[in-house]
Amino acid sequence: MNGLITVVMPVYGRAALVEQAIASVRNQSVPHWRLLIADDGSDPPTEALLRRLASADPRIDLVRRPRNLGLFANLNATLAEVTTPWLLILCSDDLLEPEAIAVLEGLIHRHPACQLLLSSYRSIDAAGALRFDVNGWYTDQFAPVSREFAPGELLPVLLRFGSINGNITGLLMRRDLFERTGPWRSDWRQAADWEWLIRAAERSRVWINRQPIARVRVHGGQLSNDNRVDQREGEEIAAVVRQLRDHPALAAWPQRHRWAAYHAQFLLWNALKAWPRVGWRATARQLALIHRGAGLGRTALALLAVLPGRLRIRGSDRPLPPPAP
């Protein structure tokens, strides 16, 4: 199995956390792995740390971008440099469980028809303490145990439940699947993984692995939080929702309009909350995006329908339940 999996780690700063992430790879229970660190133009202290850690282990390779490309452009460039058959993504603020590589190698050999594996993970806070696992709670609704999905079978799941991976950490794919599916949208910052999953799920069998193989950190400095503050997520999420709603494979699913409106109501909620800060012009643009993605009327009704649920979970880390089947 030597040379089966390369762990790909995109890095941009966060020196204190990236050292822990690299240590979690080096502490794997099996020795036959590769780690490819893609430094996306980090600050000098982080660059120096990465060079020191890479020089300490021959299994670690380091590439450095002369300028910051952004997460998905950096990943596109990095995945093109992977030479092993499989690649596993690990974000620089997350951790692999010690048995992760061993577990994934076993799954690869037991399910050879699956070229994409999405694994559960444990959710931790900034200090590393376990917290409520929102993504696992959602996954319980459609895959309470590990199971295989045929090509195209995940498309309704991706519309009803959203970006089911929840995070790119733990995403394991065959290199040739990435080549056939095409790159992530490098001009996107929030929903590029969701959009890419649509294309990948059309082409390959997918294994949903419910054994956690990583610890994913939730903290205020994440890119997703930055995108939400300045509303960049609206355009991308509305586009993905519309893509799924109008997908030919879902034409016979009348629920698709209701599911699309459920996701769009989050955008409407955020747009209304941001209105005093961003003004009418920016809010009107968000409303237009929502209308194109799911229909403003349907979305407003969906928002009203979930308001009682919002009040019940206010102040907690519990999520809204997914839309009905």
Regions found by a protein language model. Name each.
Residues 159-161, 194-195, 202, 218-325:
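C-terminal subregions of glycosyltransferases and related glycan-biosynthesis enzymes
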Residues 23-32:
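Short, acidic, metal-binding catalytic loop of nucleotide-sugar glycosyltransferases
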Residues 44-52, 95, 99:
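Acidic helix N-cap motif at the loop->helix transition within catalytic regions
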Residues 7, 138-237:
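Conserved nucleotide-sugar donor-binding catalytic segment
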Residues 87:
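Short aromatic/hydrophobic "clamp" motif used to bind/position activated sugar donors
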